[in-house]
From Swiss-Prot:
Gene3D superfamilies: 1.50.10.10, Galactose-binding domain-like (2.60.120.260), Immunoglobulins (2.60.40.10). Belongs to the glycosyl hydrolase 9 (cellulase E) family. GO terms for biological process: cellulose catabolic process. It comes from Streptomyces reticuli. The lineage of its organism: Bacteria, Bacillati, Actinomycetota, Actinomycetes, Kitasatosporales. This is Cellulase 1. CDD domains: E_set_Cellulase_N (cd02850). The gene is cel1. This endoglucanase acts only on crystalline cellulose. Pfam families: CBM_4_9 (PF02018), CelD_N (PF02927), Glyco_hydro_9 (PF00759).
Length: 746
């Protein structure tokens, strides 16, 4: 998900009253204190409070916090009018305790006015003894309206919070962030297939070949060889060697690679290694569902109340109005998936995510190595399991029903178009469970891009659900036809790039690719000449659409091209379509071969894009598709090497998939998978893909740690880093598709 800001200070925290207003100290080149009266020697002024009873106790500010609140910011203590200077480094420190122990304080430095940005936050678990806490960050903006706040709500029971020695010191030396990259031998930390490629990367200063050994779980060397020096890798700035141990065909668990005095993280060699990830990557979607209670018996540790069913404090989603001036009706837009780390629901991202899940299933029907039963009925532990419909189709239908609801009703202006998105009026804070979201919900204007996403996915659904539910398939096809005609009538209704308050803009100024994709899906489902003609006449049809950064929600031509190549049809010139996919795969294969980390991804200028992890995987999808078209093992092997990257063979030596690998991402930016901020909440479920390196590092936390980063190092596993570490439904769809392909190769 793309966004510009995430609000994490709320109006509630501003309701307290400051008793005095003291002069503001300006930050300077030397260390300068920005907090006034952080020692509470004789008074609590100018600190304000909200929903606590506070006073002095032994030279500390102590507050009695009521129980029964929901959110951290429901009770708070803070100080406003803090001056911060852009580019200045600050040390935020304090002593704090809690009675009884085990309660959490959310300590934040941010903006006291809209949009309530947060620049530093931490959520320590307090003990009854004073604990000392210190954090360093760099201010991303100039402001005289900063705020230091201690948010102490969200507890069922009453407790006592005490704080002292609060300091925000400007002019301190910036901390140098050094990620712990572990052993210098980088491997796929999950597994390699016995008959598949097996490659690793060694980070070393050596320029000559070095010996390596493959050891089994007992420490016995089972294979050996010499590394291949590759020089300095541009994507990481590291001097590296390659290791190829693909000739070893044994099976087992707990293997390690040893080279240059380093021992890799352990991994397996197992034909069934990817089967759990195939399931977990799709199970992810159940816990993303809106409008339904998540059952703890189906997802232990992730049970929660239904979100956005018009039960207070929710204000949606059963009768959601439009933004002012957009429409005069309301729509029932319950259901669907929450898009990413927020509570928004977006047609364009929902569209590409649904397409990729449906295509994962469709591949199982058409590919020589496909296994339809692998995601069949009963495999995903869903509420719908047991209904004789493949579980992957049950899950995708939850989103499809929402997409259909976003269509403008007949008789209304722009009938047949699809609203672009639905989300909160303002940004909300973290953590926040879906059923506790208090914000007003709004429909945003219909767009051509959203309408064509609906047309494409509904048309695809019509052919795939027909064997299981003819009525739904017919309804989907009718909606797709209606959307297509509406898009033809309104070909240039574009999303406002500035419409990014409360949710991502998802703006797209070129919908030629969406027209092509929708026409392709409608043709593949109906076989009608009108849609074939649009496909063949489109400039997209013969264009080189497979760029270095792959495809995503804003670049959907590949969705149409891949399906035209893979799904049987009588399209004239289909052989040329298939050859274009194979040609693209050859390009990605050349990129992979040249890359010291074996990635089918080399963005221009080494500028890693937002959500780069899923772009690597989608380039792998093209390689996998070429394998399905040709049967050539080189394409299968290339696709599998893309999985190596996301599962640990990378510069940071970590798996970007939660729960998979010795070291994996687990603090993704999310309002309810927020264990880092609230120990009572879970981390993301196993099988959740992190966005991955992003050279633009748009969020303040990443900027404070990663400024000047090189390619693969532009990532940090922290919940505050929404630009490098969010989770999103379209990203996980790429993982699901590739995990399913990999599992089929075992």
């Amino acid at each position: 998900m793309k966004r510009r800001t995430t609000a994490v200070l709320t109006l509630t925290a501003l309701l307290g009253t400051a008793l005095t207003a003291l002069p503001v100290q300006q930050a300077g080149a030397e260390e300068v204190e920005q907090v006034r009266n952080g020692t509470f020697d004789t008074t609590t002024d100018p600190w304000w409070t909200s929903n606590v009873t506070a006073g002095l106790s032994d030279g500390r500010l102590c507050a009695d916090v009521p129980g029964g609140t929901t959110n951290r910011w429901d009770s708070a203590i803070g100080q406003n009018d803090i001056t911060l200077v852009k580019g200045e480094t600050y040390r935020f420190s304090f002593h704090a305790s809690g009675i009884p122990e085990g309660h959490v304080v959310r300590a934040v430095v941010g903006l006291a006015v809209s949009p309530y940005d947060t620049w530093q936050e931490a959520s320590p678990v307090l003990t009854e003894a004073d604990g000392s806490y210190s954090y360093t960050f760099t201010a991303p903006v100039d402001t005289t309206q900063g705020q230091v706040a201690f948010q102490v709500g969200g507890s069922t029971d009453a407790w006592r919070f005490c704080v002292d020695d609060v300091s925000l010191l400007g002019g301190v030396p910036p901390e140098v962030y050094e990620p712990d990259t572990g052993p210098r031998v980088r491997v796929n930390q999950v597994a390699y297939l016995p008959a598949g490629p097996k490659n690793a990367t060694l980070v070393t200063d050596a320029t000559a070949r070095l010996p390596w050994q493959l050891r089994n779980a007992q420490g016995t060397t089972v294979a050996r060889g010499l590394t291949v020096p590759r020089g300095v890798d541009a994507s990481s700035g590291q001097n590296v060697h390659s290791i190829d141990f693909g000739s070893y065909r044994g099976r087992g668990t707990g293997y390690t690679l040893v080279a240059d005095g380093e021992t890799s993280h352990p991994f397996d060699i197992d034909a069934a290694a990817y089967r759990p990830l195939r399931l977990d990557s799709v199970k992810y979607y159940y816990t993303q569902r809106s409008g339904i209670a998540i059952r703890d018996d189906l997802r232990p540790g992730y049970g929660r109340a239904a979100g956005h069913l018009n039960v207070a404090p929710n204000q949606g989603d059963a009768n959601v109005p439009c933004q002012p001036g957009v429409c005069d009706y309301t729509l029932d837009v319950t259901g669907g998936w929450y898009d990413a780390g927020d509570h928004g629901k977006y047609v364009v991202n929902g569209g590409i995510a649904t397409w990729e899940l449906l295509s994962t299933y469709e591949r199982s029907l058409t590919a020589r190595t496909g296994h339809p039963a692998a995601l069949g009925d009963g495999t995903l532990a869903l509420p719908e399991s047991g209904n004789k419909v493949p579980d992957v189709l049950d899950e995708a239908r939850w989103e499809l029903e929402f997409l259909l609801k976003m269509q403008v009703p007949a008789g209304q202006p722009l009938a047949g178009m699809a609203h672009h998105k639905l989300h909160d009026e303002q940004w909300t804070g973290l953590p926040l469970l879906p059923d506790q979201d208090p914000q007003k919900r709004e429909l945003h204007p219909p767009t051509t891009a959203a309408t064509l996403n609906l047309a494409a996915t509904a048309a695809q659904a019509a052919r795939l659900y027909r064997p299981f539910d003819k009525a739904f398939a017919a309804r989907a096809l009718t909606a797709a036809r209606t959307a297509w005609q509406a898009a033809l009538a309104h070909p240039d209704l574009l999303a406002d790039p500035n419409d990014g308050t409360g949710g991502g803009a998802y703006n797209d100024d070129d919908v030629t690719d969406e027209f092509y994709w929708a026409a392709a899906e409608l043709y593949l489902t109906t076989g009608e000449r009108q849609f074939a003609d649009h496909v063949l006449d489109s400039p997209v049809h013969t264009a080189d659409i497979f760029g270095p950064t792959g495809f995503d929600w804003g670049h959907t031509a590949a969705a149409g091209r891949l399906d035209l190549a893979l799904v049987p049809s009588r399209l004239p010139g289909r052989d040329q379509v298939r050859r274009s996919v194979i040609k693209a795969a050859d390009t990605y294969l050349a990129t992979l071969t040249a890359h010291p980390y074996g990635m089918p991804y080399a963005p221009a200028g080494n500028r890693y894009d937002w959500g780069s992890s899923h772009q690597v995987l989608n380039n792998g999808v093209v390689l996998a598709s070429a394998y399905d078209l040709t049967g050539a093992a080189k394409y299968r092997d290339g696709a599998l090497q893309g999985m190596d990257y996301v599962l640990g063979r990378n510069a940071l030596n970590m798996s970007y998939v939660t729960g998979y690998g010795e070291v994996s991402s687990h603090n993704q930016h999310s309002r309810w998978y927020a264990h880092q901020l609230d120990p009572t909440l879970p981390n993301p479920p196993s099988g959740t893909l992190a966005g991955g390196p992003n050279s633009s590092i748009q969020d303040p936390y990443a900027q404070s740690k990663l400024t000047g980063c090189v390619g693969q190092f532009c990532y940090i596993d922290d919940i505050q880093s929404w630009s490098t570490n969010e989770t999103a439904i379209n990203w996980n769809a790429a993982l699901a598709r590739m995990a399913s392909f990999a599992a089929d190769q075992g």
